[in-house]
Amino acid sequence: MSVLTSLLLRGLTGSARWLPVPRAKVHSMPPEVELGIMEKAIGLTSCFVSLFLPAGWILSHLEDYKRPE
């Protein structure tokens, strides 16, 4: 890296060092009611189905997309 490039980069990032970073005031507490095994299983199953079912459908019909009509 040339001297000019390093000076230019230092000049561009120098002013950003003094900007205040906003901090989120988020405080968390333990849940009032623990999730049961069945609720966790239903949640994970619905996440997997919603992600993998459309992807599987597209992959299984990939040849249909390749055919010229």
Curated annotation (Swiss-Prot):
| UniProt keyword annotation of Methyltransferase present | no
**The protein's name:** Cytochrome c oxidase subunit 8A, mitochondrial
Q: TM spans, by residue? A: 37-60
According to its UniProt entry, the function of this protein is described as: Component of the cytochrome c oxidase, the last enzyme in the mitochondrial electron transport chain which drives oxidative phosphorylation. The respiratory chain contains 3 multisubunit complexes succinate dehydrogenase (complex II, CII), ubiquinol-cytochrome c oxidoreductase (cytochrome b-c1 complex, complex III, CIII) and cytochrome c oxidase (complex IV, CIV), that cooperate to transfer electrons derived from NADH and succinate to molecular oxygen, creating an electrochemical gradient over the inner membrane that drives transmembrane transport and the ATP synthase.
Q: Which family does this protein fall into?
A: Belongs to the cytochrome c oxidase VIII family.
Name the principal localization, coarsely classed.
mitochondrion
Where's the transit peptide located? 1-25
GO process terms (BP): mitochondrial electron transport, cytochrome c to oxygen
UniProt keyword list: Membrane, Mitochondrion, Mitochondrion inner membrane, Transit peptide, Transmembrane, Transmembrane helix, Ubl conjugation
Its annotated pathway?
Energy metabolism; oxidative phosphorylation
A cellular component annotation (GO) from this entry: respiratory chain complex IV
Species of origin reads Macaca silenus
Kindly report every residue range on the membrane side named Mitochondrial matrix.
26-36
User: Where does the motif SIFI-degron lie?
Assistant: 2-19
Assembly, per entry: Component of the cytochrome c oxidase (complex IV, CIV), a multisubunit enzyme composed of 14 subunits. The complex is composed of a catalytic core of 3 subunits MT-CO1, MT-CO2 and MT-CO3, encoded in the mitochondrial DNA, and 11 supernumerary subunits COX4I, COX5A, COX5B, COX6A, COX6B, COX6C, COX7A, COX7B, COX7C, COX8 and NDUFA4, which are encoded in the nuclear genome.
Where in or outside the cell it occurs: the entry states:
Mitochondrion inner membrane
**InterPro entries recorded:** Cyt_c_oxidase_su8, Cyt_c_oxidase_su8_sf
Q: How is it modified after translation?
A: In response to mitochondrial stress, the precursor protein is ubiquitinated by the SIFI complex in the cytoplasm before mitochondrial import, leading to its degradation. Within the SIFI complex, UBR4 initiates ubiquitin chain that are further elongated or branched by KCMF1.
Which Pfam families does the annotation name?
Answer: COX8 (PF02285)
